[in-house]
């Protein structure tokens, strides 16, 4: 991470007074459509998606250090942020081509780092699916793509947050026991690759290195990792990068995510915050679709507020300042 004066200002806007990134993620597009479609027969509309993002921004950004949105449905919400909250905008197209296992990255057609900056964003976020065991040809293609995004961000003097979602080309179900066995290596090795300074990444947004459902004492099903083994993976993950890194919530329940962060800290992971999405706001979708805006607001002011406040308390005890990694 090369910290220019301009980037320092952006990073301080994105983090709290202790240098911890307690960011709210709502750049979901395809996932949000699918969530909304569970509660109504009609296809979710652009207006519905925009409105819910605005509601979440209005109600929850007073309690977050920043918010991640997308330029497709999230622009109205960028105007609804609390004045102290920073803004990140997603640069990638949502989803991936399911007809292939390659999961190639793709930028939004009419966006650039320059345009994201002009929109008032404090950072560019890009999501990459990466399997360290894919062919060198495919992974070189992905690495070159990230180099381009990194160079754009350097040119615009804006922080670059890379979100890495590890996967296995041969295992379709990421929630399976089969994938849980290989996940630690997939996540940790991908972090090592993108910690190279050639990519010009400022912050890594990463998964926790284990599927906690399969860790002794966390789930009530099959145990794949003992607590000791899981703790060692968190420690290895911390040692895999010299960059600031933050955890994504991966759609798990709020309580489980909080317990995971405590375990990460106890295991020696010096992570620098979170970008937490569905674990905070998911319950508001049902209220919004079935009861309307006021019911969604009520949910956000009660359960949503409780989720984010509890998370903030956990972060105070567990996360460290990104400045310690600069």
UniProtKB/Swiss-Prot annotation:
This is Tagatose 1,6-diphosphate aldolase 2. NCBIfam families: lacD, PRK04161.1, PRK12399.1, PRK12858.1. Pathway: Carbohydrate metabolism; D-tagatose 6-phosphate degradation; D-glyceraldehyde 3-phosphate and glycerone phosphate from D-tagatose 6-phosphate: step 2/2. Coiled coil: none annotated. It holds the Pfam family DeoC. GO terms for biological process: 6-sulfoquinovose(1-) catabolic process; D-tagatose 6-phosphate catabolic process; lactose catabolic process via tagatose-6-phosphate. One of its GO terms (molecular function) is tagatose-6-phosphate kinase activity. Belongs to the aldolase LacD family. PANTHER family: SULFOFRUCTOSEPHOSPHATE ALDOLASE. It catalyses: D-tagatofuranose 1,6-bisphosphate = D-glyceraldehyde 3-phosphate + dihydroxyacetone phosphate. It comes from the Bacteria. Keywords: Lactose metabolism, Lyase. SUPFAM superfamilies: Aldolase. Its EC number is 4.1.2.40.
